Each structure stands twice: as C-alpha cells, then as structure tokens.
Amino acid sequence: MSFKEIKSTLEDMDEQSRLSAAHDIMDDTRKNVKSLGKKILNAYEKKQNEIARVKKLYEFDKQFGNIVIAGVDEVGRGPLAGPIVGAAVILELNVEKDLDLILGINDSKKLSSKKRQELSEIIKEKALAWEIASLDNNEIDKKGISWCNNEIFKIAISKLKKVPELVISDGYAVKGIGIKNHYIVKGDAQSASIACASIIAKVYRDNLMGEYAKSYSEYGFESNVGYGSKDHIDAIKKFGTTPIHRMSFLKNII
C-alpha cells in the first residue's frame, strides 16, 4: 500500500484498530510510514496521560463521599473595571466510561482562550447543574470586593437546579450558605468541579469584557479584560474613567 492509502485506511479505523495497525507499521522501512505510526502512538499516549490526569481531579472530589458536590470559583477580584463573576458547577463524578470525562479541564489561567471557550460549552452540556452570578463595579464600590466575592457564590449556589450537599471552593470559605463547605488552596488545579467553575466563569467574564471593548475602545478591554495593564492605566489617565470602572480601585491612579 502507498503512504496515502495507509493514512486513509488508518483514518477510517476505530481507535483500538488504529493503535494495533500503528504498531505494525513501525516495522515499515519507509520513513514517512514509520513517522505516521509514531505520531499515532504518541497521540494515544498523550490522551492516556490526560485521562489519568483528569481522573485524579474527579477522584479528588469523590474523596468527600458519594454526595452532590458543587464546585465554585470566581474571576475578577483584581481588575480595575468590570464585574466580579462566580460560577457553581455540579458534575457527574461517578463516570463509568473515559468518554464521559471532561478532558482538558484545569485551572482556567493555564488554558488558552480558545480551549476555555471549547471547554465551557462541553462543561455546560455535561454538568448535572451549573450557574453563573456576577456583581458589577457599582456594587463592588458600595459593598467591597470581599463581600461581593462571597455574595456571587451565594447567588450562584442558590440558583442551582440541584441542591448540593457540599460546596467546595478555591482558597476561601463561602459564608452564609447553610451548606457544608470545604475550601481548598489551589483548588482549581486539584478539583474537577472547581476547575469547571473556574472555566465557565472566566469565559463568561472575558466575553462580557470583549463586548464592553466595543463601547470603550480606548481601554483595551478585549485584551486586558479590565486588569491594570500599563496601556489600561495610561488610557485612564488620558481619557478618564468609564461607567464600568471601579472607583474604589483607582485611588492611586486618578
């Protein structure tokens, strides 16, 4: 068979048949055929490693028992503009097939924008329940960022279609929810549920800031998403503030 025919045949195979065939063609004397086999084997190994990594995230959550667990996380504590956004996600943790795992989930900051967008849709499809809540800059200026951070979690949790028996959060305890809570340092890198909440919250907020960028084009919100980059601070000094700026965060700038 020619290289083109081999490649076409492999593409039509199921995963296990393709893997077996890849081992076979490693004995082929043609470099391009052998390279194709190596590529398939490397891709399979990479996928298996990812499955093992994500299973650990699911197992982390399952350690708390066979109960309904909501993971919560926020994005937007530190920006000079825009809302703070929180999300709550309940996953099916007792997955029987690897296909049911949400591969790729991680701390949202470690993922590309494109990957976050893709995963956000998958998470919403596969989650048993999810909710997003936000409070704007005016509320942040009135109540303070810490109060708002806790409040968005309370709102998101209260809106979930399933009532969680445990809430796990990233770094901070969630107060006043009337539900048992565990907070975990670097939780978005350890817990599947928190990682998923981290992703959908960030995608929601980034998209919102992208919309604001259309109205306030001088500030670069499409790239800095409200954080205090040099260009953003320079724009504030040159053009002043917008209706979405957090005035309580700008005392040392204006």
Curated annotation (Swiss-Prot):
EC number annotated for this UniProt entry = 3.1.26.4
Give the record's GO biological process terms.
DNA replication, removal of RNA primer; mismatch repair
**GO cellular component, as recorded:** cytoplasm; ribonuclease H2 complex
Domain RNase H type-2 intervals = 67-254
Q: What class of enzyme is it?
A: hydrolase
> What family does this belong to?
Belongs to the RNase HII family.
Q: What is this protein called?
A: Ribonuclease HII
In its UniProt entry, the species of origin is given as Clostridium acetobutylicum (strain ATCC 824 / DSM 792 / JCM 1419 / IAM 19013 / LMG 5710 / NBRC 13948 / NRRL B-527 / VKM B-1787 / 2291 / W)
